[in-house]
Every structure is written in C-alpha cells, then in structure tokens.
C-alpha cells in the first residue's frame, strides 16, 4: 500500500530556523516518497494568538545562546549566514506580512517559484544582512531571480485571495497547537493530523515517523548561492 501520509511545512522568512528546516525538508524530498506541502504563514499572528512572551530574543542569556546556535546550525546545513545589524530590534519590531503575502502570490503562480523566492529572501537577509520587509525590497529579490511580471506579482499580494490564504494557513497551524516556526503537521490521506512537530531539528524524528530515510544535511543538494 502506498504511503498516504503528507507533511505540511509552515514557515515564515523572518525565522532563521524556518530557513534551516526548509532546506532540510526540501533536500530530503529527493529521497522521500511522502508528499510535502509548503505553507507560508504569518509567525507574528501565531505569537499574538499564543500570547507568548518567551521569545528567546527577549531573554539576554537565551539571545546570546541563540546567536551562537544559529551560526552552528547554518554551518551544519551548509548555508551562508550572518546576523544582520540591529537583528534583535528587527526581529521584535518588524512585520513579515509583505514577504509572506508575496510568497503566497508566488505559490499561486508556481510552487517552484515560491521556493526560489523564499530562498532568495532568506539569502538576502541572512547572508547579506539586507532588509526584506517592504514591497520594493522584495521586488529587488524577484528581479534578481529574473521573475516575470514582478510588478504584477507584487500587486497580486494585496488581493483578497492571497490575504485569505495566508490567514487560513496561519489559522490551520494555530488550530493544531502551533506556537513557533517552523511548524509541521503530518496528516493521513484524509487530512487528519497524526502528529505535530516544532523545530528544524526534528527532521530525524519526522523521517522515522514516515518510515523514510534521514540523510543528514545533504549539503550536496544545497542550491547555488
């Protein structure tokens, strides 16, 4: 009997751990039979809903550790990474609603395009320290990727359809207990959630639950920078 399980991967480009999880799970797609659905969502909406005051960046000793852990994790995944200047302030006070909506708009056009745009945004922010939070900043990434009809895609991000999809993705995650990013649902063939998973470091357990192989960082699969 074919494996009917599905992995839903919820992510926000403001989250560096979403970046690591995104790379890990998309690299494993080449060796897994289990379908993977990528779900851009709005992390700030999750934080507001859970009234979570315990973000690591608000606790100095956790913030210090997290900065080291991010570099350690990026090295493991083979991802060029450095913390942008004024990183803590940006993370706590900047909204990712614009890039997340543009990711949804990109996904409506083509799922591969959405993944390319997500990587481009992460690379701009976490490799070069450049902001990604306004339409003009995201448009620069789209043009660097030679995306067609950039202005049309950016305009599409303001549509009711896009806003509704992003809200639905966020509500779906929250409805199944989400409190952080990245977040995963493993469902059966009928959409019933069998397991929820938090964090980029849980891919070995995800693979085991799916009876799929875990191949480590698979650095040979990383896209060209």
Swiss-Prot record:
Chief site of localization: mitochondrion
EC number(s) recorded for this UniProt protein: 2.5.1.18
Catalytic reactions on record: RX + glutathione = an S-substituted glutathione + a halide anion + H(+)
Gene: gstk-2
Protein family membership: Belongs to the GST superfamily. Kappa family.
Stored Pfam families: DSBA
Disruption phenotype: Significant decrease in respiration rate and a lower concentration of the monounsaturated fatty acid cis-vaccenic acid.
Protein name according to UniProt: Glutathione s-transferase kappa 2
GO biological process, alphabetically ordered: glutathione metabolic process
Binding site for glutathione: 15-17, 52, 200-201
């Amino acid at each position: 009997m074919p494996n009917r399980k599905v992995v839903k991967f919820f992510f926000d480009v403001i989250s560096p751990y979403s970046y690591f999880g995104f790379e890990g799970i998309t690299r494993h797609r080449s060796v897994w039979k289990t379908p993977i659905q990528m779900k851009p969502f709005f992390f700030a909406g999750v934080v507001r809903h859970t009234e979570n005051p315990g973000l690591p960046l608000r606790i100095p000793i956790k913030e210090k550790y997290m900065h080291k852990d991010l570099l350690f994790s990026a090295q493991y995944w083979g991802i060029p990474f450095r913390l942008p200047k004024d990183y803590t302030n940006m993370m706590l006070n900047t909204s990712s609603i614009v890039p997340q909506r543009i990711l949804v708009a990109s996904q409506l056009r083509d799922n591969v395009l959405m993944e390319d745009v997500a990587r481009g945004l992460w690379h701009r922010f976490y490799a070069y320290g450049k902001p990604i939070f306004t339409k003009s900043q995201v448009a620069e990434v789209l043009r660097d990727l030679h995306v067609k009809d950039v202005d049309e895609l950016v305009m599409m991000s303001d549509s009711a359809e896009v806003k509704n999809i992003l809200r639905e993705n966020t509500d779906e995650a929250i409805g199944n207990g989400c409190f952080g990013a990245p977040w995963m649902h493993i469902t059966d063939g009928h959409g019933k959630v069998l397991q929820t998973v938090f964090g980029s470091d849980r891919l070995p357990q995800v693979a085991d639950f799916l009876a799929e192989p875990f191949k480590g960082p698979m650095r040979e699969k990383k896209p060209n920078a």
